[in-house]
Amino acid sequence: MTRYSVQSVDPTKTASARGAYLRTSFKNTYEVAGAIRGWNLQKALAYLDQVTDHKRAIPFRKHAGSIGRTGQGKEFGVTKARWPVKSIKFVQDLLQNAQANAETKGLDKETLVISHIQVNQAPKQRRRTYRAHGRINAYQSSPSHIELILSEPAEEIAKAKETSLAHISSRQRGRIAAQKRISA
């Protein structure tokens, strides 16, 4: 069994998937993961489909150097956004894998939430390119490791009403008693 950077609280209510040494840009995949972290699974898959069709965009926050601006970033409060199709394809495949794992465990796919998604850098794949005057430059790719965990949200328990009052001084107690006598 592979290790994840986060231990799930209740393994019976979570499903996970991971991909290692995926040949897709680390920076683009990092931004895609950040855009859907904490989202409902169905909502995230629909959003990624819309980004693939260029109807919405992925906001670029950290790795945003030399990136053009687009109005589609306004919904996220940013000006720099892109449509990284290859990274989206890898993330969609992992989400569908985790969804299949969740269905195998008997979890409800309508309520699943992306509770953890993390992108790490994999070792660079090195090639070379030949330049003028006999020089050679490095020509590297930046692959990624991706891991994600889907979980059913915890049921919210209603907070019990407070039965005891805060500390009351003797003067306040006397005043409350006097008001009760007057109203009775």
UniProtKB/Swiss-Prot annotation:
It comes from the Eukaryota. GO terms for molecular function: structural constituent of ribosome. SUPFAM superfamilies: Ribosomal protein L22. Pfam families: Ribosomal_L22. The keyword Ribosomal protein applies. Keywords: Ribonucleoprotein, Ribosomal protein. Belongs to the universal ribosomal protein uL22 family. InterPro entries: Ribosomal_uL22, Ribosomal_uL22_CS, Ribosomal_uL22_euk/arc, Ribosomal_uL22_sf. Disulfide bonds: none annotated. This is Large ribosomal subunit protein uL22. One of its GO terms (biological process) is cytoplasmic translation. NCBIfam families: uL22_arch_euk. One of its GO terms (cellular component) is cytosolic large ribosomal subunit.
